[in-house]
């Protein structure tokens, strides 16, 4: 279909050949040009989706190719003679203490797209007598943040079972909860999660498609509505500078030598780490404790189940 629509026979996965076809043969408006030719990365192509019918086909082809190479071919290589896949779960590879998965990474199986969800169907129980069960905490990092910062507005929203992103949008935009639009909620969601990761106005602006000034104002409004969160974040950075480390709620430390760097970017990274490590690390601690308790309960009850 790509060859028919473009009128050219070429290697779709070659950025150089694709650039020539799109920008020279078809005359589409060229974006950035690199030393090796025209840039054909996802951002450039997304901006050209409506310019020519071949562009969405190329994006779709790339998505299919990635899914096949990473998940179909990749998982087949790692499955044993009985069709089982055994991942490696790492306890202490990530700096925040989150569990990570490798060979294959089973924490990264796609779910956002329809085709990605099909990939999940390859994981099935060993027989008709067994089930695969999964469980997850709802908004655990934001709940941890609300607790550690003792932010009453956010705690109140969680205790009432409200949609935290809609509640944040209502707080920041100054509108009743039932007047929050999907766009408002989407922006508030980006800020809620961004705060956990120490997002900057530049990063937020890019995420939600607004100017840097608007993003800065949004963050300022957020902290005005949730003042204890700002105080808590500042106290984490102070602790990092004074002690050289920050801790989770359970006392697990992360050393932050970056905070004493003379390089501004390195120091800024250290400050973001000081803000997000106690939150992400505490959430990781809670999940690990829960996993141990579940495993103990399964053994104690003599259930034919594995965690």
How should these model regions be labeled?
Residues 86-87, 91-94, 170-304:
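Conserved catalytic core of nucleic-acid polymerases
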């Amino acid at each position: 279909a790509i060859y028919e629509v473009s009128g050219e026979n070429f290697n779709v996965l070659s950025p150089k050949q694709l650039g020539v076809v799109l920008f020279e043969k078809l005359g589409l408006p060229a974006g950035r040009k690199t030393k090796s030719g025209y840039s054909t990365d996802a951002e450039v192509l997304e901006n050209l989706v409506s310019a020519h019918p071949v562009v969405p086909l190329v994006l779709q082809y790339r998505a299919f190719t990635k899914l096949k190479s990473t998940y179909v071919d990749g998982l087949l290589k790692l499955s044993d003679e009985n069709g089982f896949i055994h991942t490696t779960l790492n306890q202490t590879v990530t700096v925040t203490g989150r569990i990570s998965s490798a060979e294959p990474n089973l924490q990264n199986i796609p779910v956002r797209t329809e085709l990605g969800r099909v990939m999940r169907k390859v994981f099935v129980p060993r027989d008709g007598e067994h089930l695969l069960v999964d469980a997850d905490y709802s908004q655990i990092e934001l709940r941890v943040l609300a607790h550690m910062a003792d932010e009453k507005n956010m705690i109140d929203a969680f205790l009432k079972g409200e949609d935290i992103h809609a509640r944040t949008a209502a707080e920041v935009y100054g509108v009743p909860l039932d007047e929050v639009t999907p766009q408002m909620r989407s922006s508030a969601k980006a800020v809620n999660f961004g705060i956990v990761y120490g997002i900057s106005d530049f990063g937020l602006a890019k995420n939600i498609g607004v100017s840097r000034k608007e993003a800065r104002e949004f963050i300022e409004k957020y902290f005005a509505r949730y003042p204890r969160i700002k105080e808590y974040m500042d106290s984490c950075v102070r602790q990092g500078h004074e002690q050289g480390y920050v801790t989770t709620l359970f006392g697990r430390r992360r050393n932050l030598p970056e905070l004493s760097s003379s390089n501004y970017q390195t120091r800024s990274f250290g400050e973001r780490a000081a803000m997000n490590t106690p939150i992400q690390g505490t959430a990781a601690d809670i999940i690990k404790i829960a996993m141990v308790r579940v495993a103990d309960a399964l053994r104690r009850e003599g259930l034919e189940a594995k965690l």
